[in-house]
A protein has these predicted regions:
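Glycine-rich hexapeptide-repeat left-handed beta-helix
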Residues: 211-220, 224-346, 351-354, 358-366
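Glycine-rich adenosyl-nucleotide cofactor-binding module
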Residues: 141-192, 196-197, 202-203
């Protein structure tokens, strides 16, 4: 990921504004990053959002400007200008433009400031007839029934990405599982149980059958198997720090990675929860250490092994993801364990709590 983007952006969009002035959403079909030409900013105007008249719009955009009395919403044309994407958003229009930039793949996650996003947005009823306020929705539903059956997709701050942006070269099995503001590189597959939040996503072709929460990115060839999760915990202001899972890294079924980054070519075995203070057993040099010891490093396998209380971490070379099963990784680990078996008649003791206690006592006596 690159540094914060200081480029500006300007775009024309259609906003749904409730009768009380609440901005429900804004759709920007063709956002463009600015150049450094000074005259461009003079033509665009001051940062912020302004309403546009008929002379500022194409016939197609003008046809979308209307008063929807059934929804009690006005659809208005606006132009939103952001002078510097490294500065925090100032209102809901600003937030929606930034979300569009991410889903259009014009900027990557964490290359623009998303501070206080939820504080700028309101809770919305997302329907097949358009966004509505939740407070008067049952009254609105009665009016909308004359236009056919009403489908409510959700009641939340953020909508589905595909209702605003459909990036090329991706597969999304369930539209509800990808939010506007997700960054999906071409070649990405989000399977039925996958989920990608805003300001998160894939930086290369990847397979997502787990959850990528806000603030999380994964590299090319990464595989999140069923029910796996990568979580960047929210700060006091609601923002989530950057967390990255490297290229060709596999997260096993029902595994969770919280506040710890992994590098390239790693394997996190099934049914594991790894947090910063999770104790790992490093088998190569027979020691215990927290998971932060290897945060962001390449080529680690972390799995459950019989006879060990802690997850076992081993340094592996040339680890590659061969699909969602990860069977080749399991086979290579078995081969390495076989080579490491003692050649004497004395069997190696399993690492139980009592074993570690005896070893600690011996070291103390010396």
């Amino acid at each position: 990921m690159g540094d914060m983007n200081t480029t500006g952006v300007s775009a024309i969009g259609i906003a749904n504004i409730a009768m009380d002035g609440t901005v429900l959403d804004t759709w920007y079909p063709h956002p463009e990053l600015s150049t450094d030409d000074a005259h461009q900013w003079r033509d665009i105007g001051e940062p912020g959002t302004v309403r546009l008249g008929a002379h500022d719009l194409s016939p197609r955009m003008l046809s979308l400007v209307r008063l929807d009395e059934d929804r009690m919403v006005e659809q208005v044309a606006v132009r939103t200008t952001i002078a510097d994407l490294s500065q925090p958003p100032i209102d809901a229009h600003d937030v929606y433009l930034r979300l569009h930039l991410l889903s259009h793949r014009l900027v990557r996650p964490h290359e623009l400031n998303m501070e206080g996003v939820y504080q700028k947005l309101t809770t919305v009823v997302w329907t097949n007839k358009g966004p509505c306020l939740p407070d008067n929705f049952e009254f609105v539903r009665t009016s909308l029934r004359s236009r056919g059956l009403i489908h409510v997709y959700g009641i939340d701050h953020l909508p589905r990405m595909v209702d605003y942006v459909v990036p090329t070269g991706v597969r999304i099995a369930e539209a509800e599982r990808v939010r506007l503001g997700a960054y999906l590189a071409s070649g990405t597959e989000v399977l039925r149980e996958g989920f990608v939040s805003y300001n998160a996503g894939t930086l290369g072709p990847a397979t997502v059958e787990g959850c990528l929460y806000s603030g999380v990115t994964v590299g090319e060839g990464a595989v999140l198997q069923h029910d796996s999760s990568v979580v960047s915990n929210a700060l006091s202001n609601g923002d989530r720090p950057a967390l990255h899972v490297g290229a060709s890294t596999v997260l096993g079924v029902n595994s969770t990675l919280m506040e710890v980054s992994l590098g390239d070519n790693c394997l996190l075995g099934p049914n594991l929860l790894i947090e910063p203070d999770t104790t790992l057993y490093f088998a190569d040099d027979d020691r215990l250490a927290p998971a932060t010891t290897i945060a962001g490093e390449d080529g680690w396998s972390i799995v459950h092994e019989p006879g060990n209380v802690e997850p076992v971490a081993r340094k592996v070379a040339n680890t590659t993801s061969t699909g969602s099963s990860g069977q080749s990784n399991q086979g290579s680990r078995s081969s390495r364990r076989a080579k490491a078996e003692p050649t004497t008649t004395e069997a190696k003791e399993p690492r139980t709590k009592k074993t570690r206690a005896r070893k600690t006592t011996k070291r103390t006596r010396r």
